[in-house]
Amino acid sequence: MVDSLVAETLRSRGADEATAIVRAASEPLPSPDEGEEFGEFFDRFGDAKVVLLGEATHGTSQFYRARAAITRRLIEKHGFTILAVEADWSDAARIDRYVRHHAREPSSEEAFSRFPTWMWRNVEVHDFIEWLRAHNENLPAASRTEFRGLDIYSLGNSIAAVLAYLDRVDPQEAKLARARYGCLTPWQDDPSLYGRATRYLDKSPCEDGVVAELRALLDKRLVYVRRDGDSFFDAAQNARVVRTAEHYYRLMYRSSKDSWNLRDRHMFDTLTRLLAARGGEAKAIIWAHNSHIGNAAATAMGWQGEFNIGESCRSAFGDSAVLIGFGTDRGTVAAASNWGGPMEIMQINPARPDSYERIFRQTFVECSLTDWRRGNKSELCDALSKPRLERAIGVIYRPDTEFLSHYFEAVITEQFDAYVWFEQTSAVTPLAGGRPHGAPDTYPFGL
């Protein structure tokens, strides 16, 4: 009993010291709605090759509005021309065609009609997309900012996109592609059933077909690119999504670690292809959950053998990659109670006393940027160098089991380069008429 009281006293004293140091280092921020004024604080990151902007939940308005304000600033003032988000490639491609004023562009409402969840079908994203379309309107096509998806949960849509492309440019190859993809036809509506059905097989009956189709498409790339390079790029990426998704759903029932790593490797590979396609000076912004954009090596994920796109960017780009985490103490969030359940507006529990969030809450700064990347920040880094709990809320939120369901250990100053803090937050606003449907695009992790 005495030992536990001593330990608690020491923890409390350490947290108080860390809070004082964080308070001194934190820069108060205006509201994200003060777009330009808010965005100016992030000019310091404008020289980066890749800026990764996180979120501690998939349903917090302030995170989306802050990322939008930062992104506008980086696009307008610092030459960023790629926005890659934690969404499926085929869904994001529809938005990309809209914002870059491509032929047969849909209306903005049509462009959003197929997003599967509140994660992207919300007013905050809609408003940013309308801004991006207006920004691009008077620019040369080669200078317009693109909107791309990094994720892999579009097996059926990506198959359809490959076939539609080949029907236009190479009908004979389209017939062969239909035969190669035919094995997956029974599973397209619910690919998780495919993973369950093949989990005891040494080799998937569908693997050879999807690999062969990707290879066939790439073998003819010189012919296809001469016709329409952008359309081929989209088709080839959809074929890669099919290949990765087929593998992912097989791994899903065998190893959560391996399936997570496959997914984030695909995200990073997609990013590098986007940068290469834009040329050597291209600069990208990423929107994804903290669990993807922070350096996994500094978290319990990495200690258990998982990696993510943030760690891959750190390894590939060094200091030219900037990893910015986001956090909150309390408020409301859009999430579901169970997998496939309806969206609910839930109350977020105040952060645990032994968490990083509690340290930032006790600074009594409502909204702040804490940047430990530059200058003499050794005292700040030392104060936050001890592993502490950090909260992650995905598509699902279970406040009754929050400690087990949503907290993990991390060293925040190694996980991120900077941290954006909102003491109290509110849920995103779903688009009018929007409804969550279909398999969530974060299955099976909720992040």
Give residue spans per PLM region.
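Structured catalytic-domain cores with a bias toward divalent-metal coordination
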Residues: 1-447
